């Protein structure tokens, strides 16, 4: 179903967009903060475990977000952009949604395959690894997770710049649809 809607995305999509933004921002902050914290310290463990939890939350929010998004047509951008802009926007949004699913899955898989499980911050609880540890595969997935995370600084940056360009340059309603 692709039901048309008004001039804004449905409230669920708007809210989950901004919640996802905050969660991704915090995930990047926590994983980068660990570099400045002493190995083996409680603070570093908290940063790393928070990163894991934030990634899992991103995945849990993104799946229903995609389902709802597929059921609703995007509100029209007024004035309508050209074909090249629409194709670029479609491509960027697809990349962002793939990232929001693949990145947490890579992180979760690499951690579980390492045999260490996934600790939850400020608790003694952990999601245990299942099966035998596969350290080589876990390391490969972790490197891919890190590469994708680095590459997505650029995609996220382009997304933000495009929103600002629509708002300040084109003066259309693209950004307002998500507010």
Which residues does each predicted region cover?
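Membrane-embedded alpha-helical bundles that constitute the cytochrome b-like, heme-associated redox core
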Residues: 1-179
